Design a protein with these regions (language model features):
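Loop/turn elements at helix/coil->beta-strand transitions in domains of secreted/extracellular proteins
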Residues: 6-9, 24, 57-62, 119-123, ...
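Generic hydrophobic/aromatic pocket-lining and core-packing "Φ" positions
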Residues: 2, 17-18, 53, 114, ...
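Active-site neighborhoods of metal-dependent hydrolases
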Residues: 34-146, 155, 217-222
């Protein structure tokens, strides 16, 4: 599979660690979880072995942590977001699950694994594995909480994944493809500002958050 993907010029990703690195896989998904074949967990009881971060880093693989459960921490730090209309896009069961998460869950092991991979040479890219739009902002906040600078966290959601996926995007420059979020605040000083979206420019069209949440955006003529 890896050889075929690479022959097509496509990066390959999976849930694996050791077999993936050995076979030349480009990326690994999720900071927790297994290969789904009952072995090769990245973390056990909130901790990971050093060889996990060493192998991923030495192979210069990309890792997408998908820290969706930490949305509770994000909402605790920024309580005004609990009434954000974008949360209404979540299915009720998922919203209830997130809002009833443990108030003081210990993510120190998760933080150590993410930063160990990053410092060992791995590339961290922001992804959520969750449908709602708030999760990405929570993901970026987690990276800063773990030790990244806001600039590094922003790159994890823009230039780094664009480079990994070989997309002509991820930066604002002549000739590049770019959807642009207009936010209130300076994310380079406070990463939570990324959640203060006021307008979005996508495919040359400008939308408000209300347009996107209500579904009006899909009816807007090109």
């Amino acid at each position: 599979i890896v050889d075929f993907a690479h022959a097509m010029g496509v990066p390959a990703s999976s849930h694996e660690i050791y077999p993936a690195a050995f076979d030349g896989m480009d990326s690994v998904e999720h900071v927790e979880g297994t290969s789904r074949r009952g072995y090769s967990p990245k973390m056990t009881l909130g901790r990971s072995y050093q060889d996990v971060s060493t192998i991923i880093g030495a192979a210069h693989m990309t890792m997408t942590p998908t820290l969706g459960p930490r949305l509770y921490d994000f909402l605790t730090k920024h309580p005004q977001m609990r009434n954000d209309p974008r949360l209404a896009l979540d299915p009720p069961w998922l919203k209830q699950q997130i809002l009833s998460a443990p108030a003081h869950a210990d993510y120190s092991g998760t933080a150590k694994l993410v930063m160990d991979v990053y410092r060992a040479g791995g590339r961290i890219v922001a992804g959520t594995d969750q449908p709602g739009p708030i999760y990405l902002h929570s993901e970026l906040q987690s990276y800063v909480d773990f030790g990244m600078s806001p600039y590094e966290a922003l790159r994890a959601a823009t230039a780094v994944p664009a480079g990994f996926l070989q997309l002509d995007a991820g930066v604002i420059a002549p000739g590049k493809l770019a959807d642009i979020d207009l936010v209130e605040g300076n994310p380079l000083e406070d990463i939570a500002s990324t959640a203060n979206v006021r307008q979005v420019i996508a495919n040359g069209r400008r939308f408000t958050v209300e347009d996107l949440v209500s579904g009006k955006a899909k009816d807007t003529p090109r």
